[in-house]
From Swiss-Prot:
Subunit structure: Part of the 50S ribosomal subunit; part of the 5S rRNA/L5/L18/L25 subcomplex. Contacts the 5S rRNA. Binds to the 5S rRNA independently of L5 and L18.
Alphabetical GO biological process terms: translation
Gene name of this polypeptide: rplY
Record's protein name: Large ribosomal subunit protein bL25
The species this protein was found in: Carboxydothermus hydrogenoformans (strain ATCC BAA-161 / DSM 6008 / Z-2901)
Classification via Pfam families: Ribosomal_L25p, Ribosomal_TL5_C
GO cellular-component term (any): cytosolic large ribosomal subunit
GO molecular function (one): 5S rRNA binding
Superkingdom classification of source: Bacteria
Gene3D superfamilies in alphabetical order: Ribosomal protein L25, beta domain (2.170.120.20), Ribosomal Protein L25, Chain P (2.40.240.10)
Keywords recorded for this protein, A-Z: Ribonucleoprotein, Ribosomal protein, RNA-binding, rRNA-binding
Length: 197
């Protein structure tokens, strides 16, 4: 399991936060069940490297003590997009967690080959599982979807030990008819002669 080191922040002022950001560090907080919240700071590049690879569960070493943590929330600057704060949740072995996991679509839908349009629904789903079973992402095969078909949460193939906490009927992806096809159908319906008695 990946591991990064954090230092304890003694000050929690705006000036201290700005100083840390200038030094290439990200201020954050580590918390968990029966654990007092601890203000920490981590190397921005190390954290961004893990996050970019989809890793949200790793070990965090604070003053020589290592905890397994989950990245619960990331805050970015609204203008620059720079990472400015992180929340770490300490996880316990044997205790299930809930976490947002991205859904990655793969395959070229049959309906798209026929001229349809692939539309995206949920791009992330909340899953419940043990920390060691947490997937980086969930793959969804859309290659068999025809025009008018959709892939729902209940259709997802999940790894062992993982359960999705979402409405089973929520749409992940659907194949809609091309606009000109819809317009042609509407014109045909409108121009069809009415049956006379």
């Amino acid at each position: 399991m990946e591991k990064i080191t954090a230092s304890v922040r003694l000050k929690k002022t705006r000036g201290e936060r700005n100083r840390l950001l200038k030094e290439g560090k990200v201020p954050g907080v580590m918390y968990g069940k029966n654990i007092e919240p601890v203000a920490v700071a981590v190397n921005a590049r190390e954290l961004e490297s893990l996050v970019e690879r989809g890793l949200k569960l790793f070990e965090l070493s604070v003053e020589g003590k290592t905890q397994r943590v989950l990245v619960k929330e990331l805050q970015h600057h609204p203008v620059t997009g720079k990472l400015i704060h992180v929340d770490f949740q300490v996880v316990e072995s044997g205790r299930k967690i809930r976490q947002l996991v991205p859904v990655e679509l793969y395959g070229e839908p049959a309906g798209v080959k026929a001229g349809g349009i692939l539309e995206h629904g949920l791009s992330e789903v909340t899953v419940e599982c043990l920390p060691e079973d947490l997937p980086e992402f969930i793959e969804a095969d859309v290659s068999k979807l025809e025009v008018g078909d959709c892939l729902r949460v209940k259709d997802l193939e999940l790894p062992p030990g993982v359960r999705v906490i979402e409405d089973p009927e929520s749409i992940i992806a659907l194949i809609s008819a091309p606009r000109d096809y819809v317009e042609e159908e509407e014109e045909t319906t409108t121009s069809a002669p009415e049956a006379t008695a």
